[in-house]
């Protein structure tokens, strides 16, 4: 995979973590909002003020609706559509508070209901705004069995899955394109209703082992005397697209973003981070022990002797420990320009002579009819890692034991990648390591796993299905207008920043103007001819899940290799339409908001602006601010790494960024301190995005009733609702194990600190909620970059 392609709003929900195939990632997952009935006793005195106000509101609303129904039925023949709009005009009297009635249309009532189900009025918003906004949500939404995290993102994602499932299970003749029919065939092969996978057992993998060149663990065709690492690596990388030892792909050149280039980076670890190999905590030791058990179980299922397999897999882990010791931590990989090392392949061969690099890449490119010579320029992002890796491998290749360990490691990378495509005993084998790693052994409904997997494989074909079913056309222009307003607010704020010099400020405004945005979905997916072209070379066969995954890997590899001599298409989407996320790509200077996130609770054109700007507006501001975070700021308006900042402004930017890093490093969760340096870019984007969205909201208030009248049952102004809407996006519950995993691997801060950290830096929040100086949510020292 490419090293640094895009910066996403949340951690990507994929089917694997750190190389281990899992059913659920560290991102936000979950489903339906739960509705709870009121308690049966109707004791007025026992009700609090909010409940009494709700009862009064409900009574008034019931009479209003009854009156309106009479009007509707007695005037049913009228052709004047305006007479049938269920709208209540505000009144200036007969209100319990002495104010006008709240907004009582169905959208306001629903929005109010959702907020009230989450909010905890017993918590002082100036002490803990996350608890104030989310405690009731957390109480009423325990993590379901089989899940490791449960939140707003996951609920919406799983509702999207249900929409997709309902279509995928329709007859093939109902689909509009061959690509969509391929999605259906793949989905059904994953469901495996006829249990073809169970009947085949280990056979597909054992057949593959022979094609790879054998495996010492299972005594399947491996001969140490004539085995070479370079030959096996060619097969794994260049034929089957398996990740091992290091990562490489064709990506956009950071210093010339109009062209593609071969990119090479560190890699090779199966567990999420190096810490898991070094037994830094009890949890790390537990995960490592379960990893050994997982490896051993799979080997035995493939025919190996248990004790012999365990011994050989411990050898693999010891090799991975060596990789862990030379792996550069995430927090030390944030300087884009410092990591960029272009060199010819002949130079790389001198740096890391364990591999004939020219031969390796020439072999890969033959798939698309392209030759590679010693003069080919590649970009290396971790030269020290490759040099150290070379030293390790050259030493191991000098002994028979070392060569056996290398064979075991390389083939294991293929085996563990495909265990989820085999029979149930193989799929169950990793439940233990998943439980240790994430606090849950999985167990979601098979159809959900298969919808997610189909999304990963033919995501734009599935996207066509989703868009036709769920995306409303009016959302796109409304979202585009919101982005324009937030961009304008961001630029206006730039004018007020005294720490940025005039020339840098002008160039920053130019870059902000140059940011392109893509919303909803790419147009071509609704054109069956164009969609079929995208997946024309992908072969999907009924009842052949294992082989289908092999074909998908080959298709993805070939698609990537074809890019090398092609100019960069800056309108290509890097995320499918049904995804509940958003991203910024620095080499394209582009922000993207898929249809999947342009839904309630993030966005609804019928909602008050305060709610839309607090939720979706902050997402938009977040992605826009990524263009100016500690990594994005290194790219100019054309998407190229270029020193366009004045040195004094860089110095002041670094000082302000250090304040953010210190702030978040001061937060603790489950006894562990957050890594503010690792999460710096996301924290800068969170803070800047919130500020831009709030200022845009204040500048664009409308005179619609929904934007003026209070929501029923909520004694909150719309400025306060903006912040509540923002916070409730992050309501979630997570296992302790997943919290640890996120703190060690995720570039985003945990949910509660994405709320507390940002709001405590924002003076407007303190003013709106009247938080006294020195309160937790209004500290005297605040951090601000943008």
Swiss-Prot record:
Residues 102-786 form the Peptidase M13 domain. Residues 74-786 are extracellular. It is found in: Cell membrane. It is a single-pass type II membrane protein. Its cofactor is Zn(2+). Disulfide bonds join 103-108, 126-771, 134-731, 190-450, 659-783. Keywords: Cell membrane, Disulfide bond, Glycoprotein, Hydrolase, Membrane, Metal-binding, Metalloprotease, Protease, Signal-anchor, Transmembrane, Transmembrane helix, Zinc. PROSITE patterns: NEPRILYSIN, ZINC_PROTEASE. The keyword Protease applies. Binds 1 zinc ion per subunit. GO terms for molecular function: metal ion binding; metalloendopeptidase activity; metallopeptidase activity. One of its GO terms (cellular component) is membrane. The active site is at 623, 686 (proton donor). The keyword Signal does not apply. Zn(2+) binds at residues 622, 626, 682. SUPFAM superfamilies: Metalloproteases ('zincins'), catalytic domain. One of its GO terms (biological process) is protein processing. Its EC number is 3.4.24.11. Glycans are attached at residues 216, 226, 256, 279, 305, 325, 356, 388, 496, 569, 715. Belongs to the peptidase M13 family. This is Neprilysin-3. It comes from Drosophila melanogaster (Fruit fly). The gene is Nep3.
